[in-house]
Amino acid sequence: MKTVSVFGSTGAIGQMIIDIIFSELDKYQVKVLVAKSNIQLLAFQAKLVNAERVVITDVNLYRELKDLLLDTNIKVSAGDDGMIMATSLDVDYAMMAIVGIAALVPMTYLINSNVKVIALANKESIVCGGALLLSLAKEKDVKIIPLDSEHNAIYQILADKGHKDLEKITLTASGGPLLSMDYEQMKYVTVQDTVKHPVWKMGKKISVDSATMINKSLEIIEAYYLFSIKAEKLDVIIHNESVVHGIISYIDGTSIAFMSVPDMKIPIMYSLSWPNRSAALCKKLNLALYNQLTFMKPDIYKFPGIKLGFEVLKTSNVHANGIILNAANEIAVNAFLAKKIGFLDIVNIVYETLNLVNYGRINSLSNILDCDAISRKVASSTIDKLC
């Protein structure tokens, strides 16, 4: 039986992880579930999968959560102390589904603990942690398996084929919920428009990132770090059906494409089953059901956010600029969701923040957090000028 911890269990990805664990409960022993504020769902999940512990990061909700679990033997913790405890547990698999840079410090704690595998649904911690985080993981012999469908696809191909004779890695993009809109229509996009993704079930923040295609910029930087690949060997293509998740091309003109139905349960199952594979818990791919698979170049005019990742990789300080990009985007997306700014303002605010913040070399976790804090302050100030 594998021991598992789940961070961000009440989010969109976290809920899928819980569903899979529950469907094969005889295979997993859940040591701890961690959530931010959804105590009702957290308590329900804990009972469902027989978790030993739960952690709520909002300390003000500790007593209420404790009351919800009075009839159980489940231990309850809260706040920073609870998070430190959760990351120090001896587990085989840690599932990291916390959104944004908030996952970075817990990731660092996890790598320094006795965890063997971290399944990572959080691209921001790689973008911000960069080579520092991955070097620490290598030093501690911790395997990081990406849960993003695109990076998981590339990870699986490389696990089998390696980097030999590799010419290019192509990440696919669904195009998001606004693909068919023209630029003029995008001036009037609402929050509701952006969170209706045509293919994937996602949380609000990642749905907006998909709509701006800044998610693909973050994924380009993530791939740069995860796969130790040069920027010029990375590419993005729009693939609306989301059947092909990643493509590796070789110097002899051949390519290997990773294909599956668009279901996040597939990379989650892969990570939980690694180094083996388990029987599918979702529909299997039947290409006969598809009349066609389409591919197109991204429209840079409509979606300038997709260029940001490549532009960051061209700079002399990739690490700091990746942190700045991520911080500005998180602030801008939150402002858009709060209806303080328009949709097209998001990318403009990120560009403006990248132009205004000039941070030095990143040599430590404290540097990362400092650069992030400065960037958030600048992005917030830029937003205030618009409001």
UniProtKB/Swiss-Prot annotation:
Q: Superkingdom of this entry's organism?
A: Bacteria
Q: Which reaction does it catalyse?
A: 2-C-methyl-D-erythritol 4-phosphate + NADP(+) = 1-deoxy-D-xylulose 5-phosphate + NADPH + H(+)
Keyword set, alphabetical order: Isoprene biosynthesis, Manganese, Metal-binding, NADP, Oxidoreductase
Which positions does UniProt annotate for Mn(2+) binding? Answer: D148, E150, E219
- A GO molecular function held by the record: 1-deoxy-D-xylulose-5-phosphate reductoisomerase activity
Q: Which Pfam families match?
A: DXP_redisom_C, DXP_reductoisom, DXPR_C
User: Which pathway or pathways does this protein act in?
Assistant: Isoprenoid biosynthesis; isopentenyl diphosphate biosynthesis via DXP pathway; isopentenyl diphosphate from 1-deoxy-D-xylulose 5-phosphate: step 1/6
Which residues make up the binding site for 1-deoxy-D-xylulose 5-phosphate?
A: K123, S149, E150, S174, H197, S210, N215, K216, E219
What this chain does, per the record? Catalyzes the NADPH-dependent rearrangement and reduction of 1-deoxy-D-xylulose-5-phosphate (DXP) to 2-C-methyl-D-erythritol 4-phosphate (MEP).
Q: What is this protein called?
A: 1-deoxy-D-xylulose 5-phosphate reductoisomerase
Q: Which organism is it from?
A: Ehrlichia canis (strain Jake)
